[in-house]
Amino acid sequence: MSSEQSHRLRKYNNLPVWVVEDHHDVLPFIYRAIGSKHLPVSNISFIHFDSHPDLLIPVNMPADTVFDKESLFSELSIENWIMPVVYAGHFSQVIWIHPCWAQQIKEGRHCFLVGKDKSTTTIRVTSTDDYFLSDGLYVPEEQLESPKSLHLDVILLEPIREQDWEYKEKGETVAKKIKLEESDQVVEGSSSGIQSSTSESSEDGLMKPTYLNASTKTSNETCTLDSNSNLAKNIIQILEKGTVYVLDIDLDFFSVKNPFKEMYTQDEYKILQELYSFKRPSVHSLEEELVDCVENRVHQLEDLEAAFADFCEDDSDETVQRWASNPGMNSLVQLVHSLKSRMEAPDYEMIHQAGLTCDYAELPHHVSTETEIEGLLQSVKNLLTCLPKPTLVTLARSSLDDYCPSEQVDYIQEKVLDVLRSLYGSLDVHLEFSPGSSSA
């Protein structure tokens, strides 16, 4: 977006902060800001702090649903609400900033297309990352209609060392360090380039930067302010000059649980991992091999979905044995037997949803200590200090589904709001969730 276009946008008197429970519920407020001309219709940057990428796609949703926003909102859920906005043409750049325990997508820059699959009319992507392949979302470029380009940057943020929490009172801030160093480094105002020490070729032949980010470790396995400074400079270079962006924070960025691990026994969870395991293609797979990989994966998931849907109606031994006779599904017998021994009526739909998270990597699970939460808060604060002010902020609590621990969510929410107030002054906070939605 040009500087002239950004100047034509309306400005909020105070920075709006929308706080919701389920993450996809932030979307109506982003669309409202587009409608009121506080955000542009296209080329919005989206900075996303989260333990989960949320970059999947509703598998069977017609692509044209994105052009009816009310229908769109009703189709989305917590893991798949960002990509439809990309296909609608609003987001062109997503920066996923994640903690060290979340490793679902490879680090670096991913440039790919998001469009309508000509054969199914659903939304699909050209990315060959395991995250998309394992959900059956890849198609070749020539199979897409109305493709939109997406620049996805995946960046690791580590907590700041405890002894540096009061660094601001003792010496230079990160922001000051960057300003002092700007004379020594040319900062390109382009969304396509990050100056870094090394780069590597991606599977699609594009050069991916190796980020000088906060994953640079110290002896205490936490980041220093110098590495945080490098990370901030990288993000500043990613954002085009004059670009407006939405700042999005899921509170499970600071502390996260895998709720399915508490629903099922260790043996049951292991069986789900076996049933839903994803066979990765080789690193240098040809397009035909990738297409075959996705087709096989889609058939695998469809068979499992059909099996558990059948169990909702009839989970007798005969039905289970019939499904277990299919290749790769023999462990269904042991799984259903174990579930029925513990539960009067197993929720087979929920079991399938749990299985879908057991493909190539487990859901992140790290219940943070107060010290770890504070270290991440300090790191987020130092990073945001260096960035332009966002147009609006969205916060997701993610506590009712137990991704952010319910006993910590209120504490984390207040701490995050305190950070935002310290950076941006008065806030226009909207609490869009039911009171008492956590146990804290």
Swiss-Prot record:
UniProt-annotated stretches for the region Disordered: 187-207
Amino acid composition bias (Low complexity), ranges on this chain: 188-200
Domain of life: Eukaryota
TM annotation in the entry: none
Record Pfam families: UPF0489 (PF12640)
InterPro entries: UPF0489 (IPR024131)
Coiled coil: none
Entry's family note: Belongs to the UPF0489 family.
Name of the protein in question: UPF0489 protein C5orf22 homolog
